[in-house]
Amino acid sequence: HWNQNTVAIRVEVECKARSEERAQENLDRIQIETKKIGGIVSAVTTIKKEMNSNSNNESMTINYYIQMPPKLAADLNQKYGNINLPSDNNGNMDIHVKYGNLNAGNFTANAMIEAKYGNIEVGNLQDAQLDLGYVGTAKIRNAKDLTIDSKYSNLDIQDIQSLRMEIKYGNLTIESVSRLDMEIKYSDAKIGTLKDALNVSSLSYSNLKIRNLSPSFSKVNVESHYGNLEVALPAKTSFRIVAENMKYSSCDVNGFN
């Protein structure tokens, strides 16, 4: 934990090459600029391109270690690398990671996360927006209010109060959720427990399964086009099923007399 009212940035650079001279040449290509303007502290890495060079058996690693007061806002951009954050993050966070992974704890303020071509794992979220593309696995423990745009990605959420989501070409698993507003295309979605309301504006060429519907649920509304919906209705509750404009489909209700 960092209890000082300052920001400390430490950068470690490692270059491996076939000779010491060649390693030094690669090291000289790396420029790291840190500066402070007003209340903003920034650090940017620039790697100069090399012309007509054989880079076989060569590599470089750049690690940033940042210590700052937990309530400070942060804007993090990482490409071809990972972002690891502490267990508690209290400031507003704007995170962009491509070709790398994000591993973080809890977020108590607003969070914007863009992840492409990697994996993410976070703890608890309050108010967050996620933009996911080609994410192999995205794990979220608990969340209060989420907006997610997901393409070619797989998500696993434990518990969430409110979710607005568009998912295409992926998989979604939610253990427990109160309110859902979704668009599902070419995907598979599984919900453990739905507590209150579900609205799916488009279930297209997709599968949606709800394992447990709370007896106190208020509404389940699904607009399906070549999609499959399976809902386990509670035995001791009253409900009404309205199936309209059905073509090339069927509606089966089992287990009720």
Report each predicted region and the residues it spans:
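Acidic (Asp/Glu) and glycine-rich low-complexity loops/linkers
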Residues: H1-Q78, N84-V97, N101-A115, N119-G133, ...
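Eukaryotic tandem repeat interaction scaffolds
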Residues: S153-E230
